Amino acid sequence: MLSIMAQHVERGDTVHIDVSHGLRHLPMIALLAALHLRVARDAKIGAIWYGAFDPDTNEAPVHNLVGLLRIADWIQALHTYDKDGDYGVFSPLLGPAGELLGRAAFFERTTNSVKAREALSGWASRKDRFLVDDPAAELFREELEHRVRWHRQPDRASWEKELAKRYLEQGDYVRAAIYGLEAAISAQAIQSGADVGDFGQRDSARDELKSSQGFRTLNNLRNALAHGVRPSDQAIERALKDETNLRNALKRLLTQLLGLERKQGA
């Protein structure tokens, strides 16, 4: 059925689907067909119509079930975020306020946590950050706010630590290493009473950390990951042999430098 529908829909068409008359499983197939047409044909689903006769009132109201696709959009966005950490996928679902979330995602993924936090805080302070006329947005509100909660951390070292932890969990090892290094530098600057946002003072904090074997190892591992630099350290060479070794090495280094909590069984 999905193949037949796709054969009769041109790219960019608007499609209305009527599931009023058919087998009971037809609405479920229609929903899959709608999702398939949006991806395979870039089609717009104008409506999914369902009419049901009510013998008590002798009327047959017709309902538009297209709102189910909105829920599917949110589920897909959550899945995408959990896979790669890019909450910019929520931006199109949030109306005008979504632009701030998209900006925050861009800055975070280009490792500018200060700008990312600024945009996230701006989004979180808006009353219209979720569309009031979108029940699906309300349904997923708590999940989204939970996923971007790092910006509520009290200081830069804390929020960079959260980002390092999250990217490690998502298997983005380059960003995990970068944010781990930045968190260590921020923590050192704070401990020294330096201005954590001043580049010169951050460089001084970095120099102070070079005496730490863990910091040097993490920095070398980051260089190997980001630039393809051949490691001279045998420990790093072992870490790069497979993903399990790499994940464990990063977890160990981040725990050593930042006190990253270990999950039970890890």
Outline where the language-model segments fall.
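Long, low-complexity, Lys/Arg-enriched
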Residues: 1-14, 29-266
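Gly/Ser/Thr-rich loops at beta-strand to alpha-helix junctions
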Residues: 19-32
